[in-house]
Design a protein with these regions (language model features):
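Short helices/loops that flank or line small-molecule/ion binding pockets
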Residues: 65-76, 124, 212-222
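Extracytoplasmic substrate-binding proteins
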Residues: 94-171, 259-273
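Ligand-binding pocket segment of bilobal, Venus flytrap-like solute-binding proteins
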Residues: 196, 203-231
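A short, structured surface patch at a secondary-structure boundary
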Residues: 13-74, 78-87
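N-terminal hydrophobic or amphipathic helices and topogenic motifs
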Residues: 1-11
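Solvent-exposed loop/turn segments at secondary-structure junctions
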Residues: 20-23, 38-41, 84-88, 111-114, ...
Length: 273
């Protein structure tokens, strides 16, 4: 039995709609019983405490179809809707439909600085002190990261890959990451590296994410670094298969010097990580 005098984690009888909202509340160690996400691959692995009900796109098509029966079945106290300002992917747009059905709704605005949103999340649950504690810890981590960043040689060439694992099929799908993606921008801006995947005519169903195709064009640019994000094992398997078929690329700087790194997947909803 847990210590009743330790206030966190708080497991609330609520449903959270929106990946960023779930992330900010999770940073405060406040969790719900249900989650509707859709922006972050494999969100169910990042938030195992919350039952995944559907994706945000499906929710916006009909806000009450899945959420309303779930809320009534679990007797949810209220629903937290993320307000992100998006014209076509904004969970807060479902507020009116839910309130018409008698479901209590609270809004968490995730626009603005990370510190500002953490304070909003803390205020929503009466946990202002916890929010300030998390902000202090984050500031300390960023200061430590700044020391690391200063030690990295600028201008290194990087090949960046993403593997997304399907929770249904248990299969992984590997992609290239282009300079358009938030993940690439975070890595290149933070560490002053260059993403060498530049294919302006490549099809992108999701901005910044491209089909793997033949990797020769990447390895011919002799990358200094190879970065695996998401399911790193799946990324490694694909690049290893390619190098076995094209052994000349084993001499590229990244492979020869063992400069192959795993990094978390990143998009705006994961700013806190």
């Amino acid at each position: 039995m847990g210590n009743p005098f330790i206030p966190f984690p708080r497991c609330e009888n609520i449903i959270i709609v929106g990946d960023a909202a779930a992330e900010y509340l999770g940073a405060l160690r406040i969790y719900g019983r249900g989650l509707i996400g859709g922006d972050v691959p494999s969100m169910e692995l990042l938030h195992p405490m919350e039952k995944h009900l559907e994706c945000v796109s499906c929710f916006l098509n009909d806000p009450t179809q899945v959420l309303m029966p779930a809320a009534r079945r679990m007797k949810a106290n209220f629903v937290v809707l993320e307000e992100n300002g998006s014209a076509d992917f904004n969970p807060a747009a479902g507020r009116e439909a839910l309130e018409k059905e008698g479901i209590s709704v609270k809004i968490l605005d995730v626009r603005g600085s990370t510190e500002l949103v953490l304070r909003r999340a803390g205020k929503l649950f009466g946990e202002e002190k916890q929010a300030e504690r998390i902000i202090r810890e984050r500031t300390e981590r960023l200061a430590a990261l700044d020391d690391v960043r200063k030690s990295i040689r600028k201008g290194q060439k990087a090949a960046i890959f993403l593997a997304i694992r399907s929770p249904v099929r248990h299969e992984s799908y590997v992609f290239r990451i282009s300079e358009r993606s938030a993940l690439s921008q975070l890595l290149t801006n933070t560490f002053a590296i260059e993403n060498i995947n530049v294919r302006p005519n490549a099809e992108e169903r999701i901005p910044g994410i491209q089909e793997l195709d033949d990797l020769s064009d990447l390895f011919e640019k002799n990358p200094d670094l190879i970065v695996y994000t998401g399911d790193a094992a799946a990324c490694g398997q694909k690049t290893a298969e390619f190098i076995r078929k094209h052994p000349q690329f084993a001499e590229c700087n990244a492979v020869k010097n063992g400069r192959i790194y795993g990094a978390p997947y990143y998009c705006h909803a994961l700013d806190l990580r």
